[in-house]
């Protein structure tokens, strides 16, 4: 399979900024911030060999933070040869300390730790030029660099870090003890941009137009003269993936919308109307609700449900191929897999499998298509930007994320037709009230979850009730890698709760999930 790494355009996956991951919780965030500076980046594990890194022909390296001390047994080591590749290098936190140690600087246990917001004093240099001399940054370290390597200028300090930043501009090397990638460092994005554009001399080539053009060429190369099928879920990911592929191969793409009976109210009609109107694509709708419900009967385990839905989804495609292609063959299956999907499904060295994604780990072993995943290196905001570049309407590109398995993973317990009707009704009320309150642009998504295996005692009218709770999970995020619960106004929550408990049978309690990600994922299952 031809991967995005084979595209040869400036600062696209052919020549990335590589974020070397030393175990940081923010490695993916660093990659995203680099992309915000319009330079492509990708994360690789610190265990990658020099040969592997050299083969990627990186235009720059960013050494991430990590939880270890450089003196701890088994701590990740920085191969000094990495600094001799002739490419610009920026070290962050642990990466900064490992870089200092490898170049002959001194890293010591100073006895002063800095965790959280810290005052940084800028002492000069180019990395922080034109920025405030005293500024807040986010620190998370116990060890500190006490002496910079020979030939490096100390350009910042803090109470617990005598050398909080250093640079050797002529060698295109720099490092910072703090975390420029987090929002708690107000000038962090400017520092990253200065390294990328001034130290590394990189242009701002990672733009929606360039991304779209590169991905279209990638698809043409991979599919050639073949035919493809794309599964539409109604969401932005599959819609943008389909639009890209159609732009590449035209009417050799057949879009299939599988109505698995796990959709929200009105979604089938919306897909058939909005997507076809925007693209003119060939669309076939498969009514498979009964098949999915039969397969899910008696299954309550989240992973079991995900894998069943993924398996049935592919089977529905195989049936569509036989029925609608009139003897032709379709060798390729287009999916809207994103970078966070791949990461959460254990798609990189050293990553743990959090849950099987419908687009990734839920596919059957006997898959009969070659996968085409043009978006698998993109974050959600980049997908939306590409969609707008392709001319898709806001009704599609601004739609809140909705999981491929649909309401099947928003019912905690067995999925039945009655439970789906209950959840679908509650979900429609929530969406209606959030839209009426003008909150759609403030909320990344708001899963509505039915606790079908839980009964809650209540009083309605003069009688005792024994109904199910509904959970509201409004979250704010930029890319789904991390998320915070959204502070929905109380009066909006009150309207939602009142309407659900009055209008939805079997529900007598509405609760609010106020957990961030991490530790919780956005979806309950």
UniProtKB/Swiss-Prot annotation:
- What are the record's GO terms for cellular component? cytosol; peptidoglycan-based cell wall
Instruction: Enumerate the GO terms in the molecular function aspect.
Output: ATP binding; GMP synthase activity
Temperature-activity profile:
Optimum temperature is 40 degrees Celsius.
List residues modified as N-acetylvaline. 2
Q: Which InterPro entries match?
A: Class_I_gatase-like, GATASE, GMP_synth_C, GMP_synth_GATase, GMP_synthase, GMPS_ATP_PPase_dom, NAD/GMP_synthase, Rossmann-like_a/b/a_fold
Family matches, as CDD domains: GATase1_GMP_Synthase, GMP_synthase_C
Locate the GMPS ATP-PPase domain: which residues?
206-399
Q: Which reaction does it catalyse?
A: XMP + L-glutamine + ATP + H2O = GMP + L-glutamate + AMP + diphosphate + 2 H(+)
Query: Per the UniProt entry, what is one GO biological process?
Result: GMP biosynthetic process
Q: Where is the Glutamine amidotransferase type-1 domain?
A: 16-205
Q: Where does ATP bind?
A: 233-239
Q: What is its EC number?
A: 6.3.5.2
The annotated active site, in chain numbering, is 93 (nucleophile), 179, 181
Q: In which pathway does it act?
A: Purine metabolism; GMP biosynthesis; GMP from XMP (L-Gln route): step 1/1
What function does the entry list?
A: Catalyzes the synthesis of GMP from XMP.
HAMAP family associated with the record? GMP_synthase
Subunit structure comment from the entry: Homodimer.
**Name under which the protein is recorded:** GMP synthase [glutamine-hydrolyzing]
Q: Which organism is it from?
A: Mycobacterium tuberculosis (strain ATCC 25618 / H37Rv)
Query: What gene codes for this chain?
Result: guaA
